[in-house]
Amino acid sequence: MAEPEAAGAVPATDPERRAFMTRLFGAGALALAASAVAPPARAAGPEHAPFIVRAQDMRARALAAGDQGFGAVVVKDGRVVGDGPSRVVTATDPTAHAEIEAIRDAARKLGSSNLAGCILYSTFRPCRMCEAAAYWAGVQRFYHGADGQDGGAPRLGC
C-alpha cells in the first residue's frame, strides 16, 4: 500500500522537479547517477540454485512464524555461513530484515564482521539499509528474487 503524500509534497515524477534537478545538477550528472544505480539484470547460473532455494526456505520460515515473507543466506566458498528469515514482526525490531539477520549470523559464525568473499542471496531485492549493511560488511556480490537476479556488488546509494 502506498503511503499518503504529505500536504504540499512534490511527487518524484513531477516534471517541474525533474527540470529543476536537471538545471541544478546538469543532465550529465543525472544520467550518470541513474546509470550508477541500475544493477546488471541477468539471472544467476544453475550453481546458485541451492542457495536461492535456501533463501526461499528462510522466507517460508518467516511466514510460518507470522513474520514478513523475506529470507536470505550468506555463502562463502560454496557453503552457507549465515542465514536468516525476517524477524521484523516477531522480534519487534524494524532492522531485523532477513538480509541483516543473515549478515549477523554469518559474522557470528565466522567470528568476524568482515564478510569479504561472501555472496548474499535474498528472496527480494534488498532495501537500501540491507544493501548498505552488505557493503559495510564487505559482501562481494548479491543475488535476489526467485531466479536470482544478479544485483552486482553492494553499493551505497541515496
What is each stretch, according to the model?
Residues 35-65, 70:
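C-terminal segment of N-terminal export signals and the immediately downstream linker at the start
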Residues 22, 53, 104:
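A cross-family signal for key residues in well-ordered alpha-helices
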